[in-house]
Amino acid sequence: MTSKLPVELRSALDQARLLRARKISARELLDLCWARVEKHNPRLNAVIVSDIGRARKAAAVADKRLKAGEPRGIFDGVPMSIKESFDWTGTPTTWGDPRFAGNIAKSDAVALTRLTDQGADIFGKTNVPLMLADWQSFNAIYGTTNNPWDVTRAPGGSSGGSAVALA
């Protein structure tokens, strides 16, 4: 059954299938996802660190591989965000704790490497509560992540930013 959802709202596996079938390019898919971030993030504060330039370069490389019929892995060209607590080279990893505000990742976390080894295109990091341990997603570095369905309510803690980014 074909999904009636816009491509940027479909599952990562559906997006990967569309990319491999060349129904959409990695750059087009990234731009659709990024447009949603730009539209909704000012109100929601889910994506708190981003590197769209790096993501666009990765999308261009993925498009070349996909065009050649040589995908890197199952997620080649699929745009994704990761939780702020995972190291992503050159970006802050603070766990929402002001004591770690100057901590810049020198390498990628193992979990992130496993995603990128499969071709995932990381564009940003999502908000977390202090030390990932609260029922909501607030910290003194990045502020509060708001529930997309009712901004007066919390989206949950630990992975609240990730949940809102998906919603």
What are the residue ranges of the model-derived segments?
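Short alpha-helix boundary/capping motifs
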Residues: 43, 61, 65, 142-144, ...
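A general structural signal for well-ordered secondary-structure junctions
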Residues: 25, 43, 72, 121-122
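Short alpha-helical functional segments enriched in proximate histidine and acidic residues
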Residues: 36, 40, 58, 62, ...
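An N-terminal boundary/leader segment
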Residues: 1-57, 67
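Conserved SET/PR domain catalytic loop and adjacent active-site segment
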Residues: 23, 70-71, 91
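Immediate post-signal peptide segment of exported/extracytoplasmic ligand-binding proteins
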Residues: 62-79
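Generic hydrophobic alpha-helical segments
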Residues: 15-19, 62, 162
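Short glycine/serine-rich loop/turn segments
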Residues: 75-167
